[in-house]
Amino acid sequence: MIQTITHIMIISSLIIFGIALIICLFRLIKGPTTADRVVTFDTTSAVVMSIVGVLSVLMGTVSFLDSIMLIAIISFVSSVSISRFIGGGHVFNGNNKRNL
């Protein structure tokens, strides 16, 4: 009985995350500004991490946790890089000095 309820809840959460992913991808494509696209990319990566986490629970394995961590690291680095590019027009300084 409990296993059936748990399975139904996991499948319904996958459906809800799938709908959220479709909405995020639509906003990522149609975003009016670059800042909207950056925020949407960050949200999309969070939804993908959630989907992978739910799939990990569904399959009963912890081997997907490494991929969740990799997605989080790539999302963080890309968000910071794009934000720096939007803010100043460059990602890295050529003279190795900080912008103050």
Swiss-Prot record:
<comment type="similarity">
    <text>Belongs to the CPA3 antiporters (TC 2.A.63) subunit F family.</text>
</comment>
<dbReference type="GO" id="GO:0005886">
    <property type="term" value="C:plasma membrane"/>
</dbReference>
<comment type="subunit">
    <text>May form a heterooligomeric complex that consists of seven subunits: mnhA2, mnhB2, mnhC2, mnhD2, mnhE2, mnhF2 and mnhG2.</text>
</comment>
<keyword id="KW-0812">Transmembrane</keyword>
<dbReference type="InterPro" id="IPR007208">
    <property type="entry name" value="MrpF/PhaF-like"/>
</dbReference>
<dbReference type="Pfam" id="PF04066">
    <property type="entry name" value="MrpF_PhaF"/>
</dbReference>
<dbReference type="GO" id="GO:0015385">
    <property type="term" value="F:sodium:proton antiporter activity"/>
</dbReference>
<comment type="function">
    <text>Expression of the mnh2 operon in E.coli is not able to catalyze Na(+)Li(+)/H(+) antiport. It does however confer higher growth rates than the control strain at up to pH 9.5. The operon may encode an NADH-ubiquinone oxidoreductase.</text>
</comment>
<keyword id="KW-0050">Antiport</keyword>
<feature type="transmembrane region" description="Helical">
    <location>
        <begin position="38"/>
        <end position="60"/>
    </location>
</feature>
<keyword id="KW-1133">Transmembrane helix</keyword>
<keyword id="KW-0472">Membrane</keyword>
<protein>
    <recommendedName>
        <fullName>Putative antiporter subunit mnhF2</fullName>
    </recommendedName>
</protein>
<keyword id="KW-1003">Cell membrane</keyword>
<feature type="transmembrane region" description="Helical">
    <location>
        <begin position="5"/>
        <end position="25"/>
    </location>
</feature>
<feature type="transmembrane region" description="Helical">
    <location>
        <begin position="70"/>
        <end position="92"/>
    </location>
</feature>
<keyword id="KW-0406">Ion transport</keyword>
<keyword id="KW-0813">Transport</keyword>
